Amino acid sequence: MMDFDERVPCSSNMYLPSCTYYVSGPDFSSLPSFLPQTPSSRPMTYSYSSNLPQVQPVREVTFREYAIDPSSKWHPRNNLPHCYSAEEIMHRDCLPSTTTASMGEVFGKSTANVYHHPSANVSSNFYSTVGRNGVLPQAFDQFFETAYGTAENPSSADYPPDKSGEKAPAAAGATAATSSSEGGCGGAAAAAGKERRRRPESGSSPESSSGNNEEKSGSSSGQRTRKKRCPYTKYQIRELEREFFFSVYINKEKRLQLSRMLNLTDRQVKIWFQNRRMKEKKINRDRLQYYSANPLL
């Protein structure tokens, strides 16, 4: 012990806990020799940068652990805007190599190991495989299948298979032809709405009414969660809501004009306005109860 103290006197030297050797005092007048001196590797100057020794980059270790090629084989960051479009660059940001390379350039090589963790590779590889819903990964597809039923055939969820299916396309074609000959403001949308509306009505025709009970039992057992049936298209609902906004009650002349414009029957427009008035009444009642229960609002 005395021999060691004779070789390295404590008065002229200083012990750094991050190092395994002694550094003399005059070395702190400038940057130490073990730190990189190039300006590109040090874009920012930190007050504590002289105390951090240069260690082995963590990037190479993590790439070796997960059997991915080192970051030197990837394209440089500054060449990305010239070679790829903006969308591809956005997708490439999810890759672990470019993420760590950009962090190394922004924060300097001395602090790259602080911002990089081995779990980043796992998370990027996990979330890069997007499931069927387009947002969550593939592991969450099982929850969407149980919640919404079989999403592969939404048409069969809307309409149960009926025995008069051969007559429905003929009726739909006839209504499409008549609507195209009329040439109203909502031609294509009204034809699509007419076709969707004719399909459930054809199932209740007198020819196929004998097998309705069998169809209902088969459809209920085949699919547990049935989607809500809407006989009106979005365009028709928008026009009906606009008319309801101006007047809650509609006269016969306006009703006939609306049914002609939206390719609906007079009875359908009348029933829609009745249902909409009941809905508005319920909304007002619930709103009144809510504000009476909360007097501070």
From Swiss-Prot:
Any one GO CC term of the record: nucleus
Annotated compartments: Nucleus
Composition skew (Low complexity), residue ranges: 167-192, 202-222
Superkingdom field: Eukaryota
Keywords: Developmental protein, DNA-binding, Homeobox, Nucleus, Transcription, Transcription regulation
Alphabetical list of InterPro entries matching this protein: DUF3528, HD, HD_metazoa, Homeobox_CS, Homeodomain-like_sf
GO biological process, one term: dorsal/ventral pattern formation
CDD domains referenced in this protein's UniProt entry, alphabetically: homeodomain
Entry-linked SUPFAM superfamilies: Homeodomain-like
GO molecular function: DNA-binding transcription factor activity, RNA polymerase II-specific; RNA polymerase II cis-regulatory region sequence-specific DNA binding
DNA-binding residues (ranges): 225-284
Keyword Glycoprotein: no
Region feature (Disordered): 151-230
Function: Sequence-specific transcription factor which is part of a developmental regulatory system that provides cells with specific positional identities on the anterior-posterior axis.
Family affiliation: Belongs to the Abd-B homeobox family.
Protein name per the record: Homeobox protein Hox-A11
